Amino acid sequence: MFLTVKLLLGRRCSLKVSGQESVAMLKKLVSERLHVPEEQQHLLFRGQLLADDKRLSDYRIGPNASISVVVRPLEKPAPEDTRLPQPLWHHLGQVLAKHFGPQDTEAMLQLLRREHEECLQRISLGDLEQLARYLLTKEPLAQPTGEREPEVLSPNKEEEKEAVQ
């Protein structure tokens, strides 16, 4: 059967595999075709993360199915205790401290962090693809009011300018 394998930002390939192939073998094929190291790949089928030790048939992946590849960074995340405070949360804490007492400020920050994490957990792969597509194709912003680009003079305009002087 043929599978379509696509990366988040649009690269894709078609691979011929059997339903009895392991996910680990599929990662090896993806690595060869799309040049993404196996250890950096997360393979998703219908939003479900595929485990290396399972077979494609375990997920009922059929012919002409589409598999998404999410590339994860190699670096290991820092332990929770040694993480540097994020500037956003620091500044938000300063703003809240102007309006609330220390205990209320801390409680509000914890609530906002929890809601932020919950919102991030609800983001789908489709949402990320749509955001990436928008960010990669959006038009440049117009010049702010009051600033103009220098005027390019055509040969006719230069002659007109000289005639006026």
Curated annotation (Swiss-Prot):
**Where does the UniProt annotation locate this protein?**
Cytoplasm
Q: Which residues form the Ubiquitin-like domain?
A: 1-76
InterPro entries registered for this protein in UniProt:
Ubiquitin-like_dom, Ubiquitin-like_domsf, Ubiquitin_CS, Ubiquitin_dom, Ubl4_C_TUGS, UBL4B
State the superkingdom: Eukaryota
Q: What is its main location?
A: cytoplasm
Q: What SUPFAM superfamilies would the database entry show? A: Ubiquitin-like
Region Disordered: what ranges? 139-165
Q: Tell me, what's a Pfam family for it?
A: ubiquitin
What do the Gene Ontology cellular component annotations say?
cytoplasm
Q: Which UniProt keywords apply?
A: Cytoplasm
Task: Name the residue ranges with Basic and acidic residues bias.
Answer: 146-165
Additional notes on this entry: May have arisen from retrotransposition of the X-linked UBL4A gene during mammalian evolution.
Name recorded for this polypeptide: Ubiquitin-like protein 4B
Q: Which organism is it from?
A: Bos taurus (Bovine)
Per the UniProt record, the lineage of the source organism begins with: Eukaryota, Metazoa, Chordata, Craniata, Vertebrata
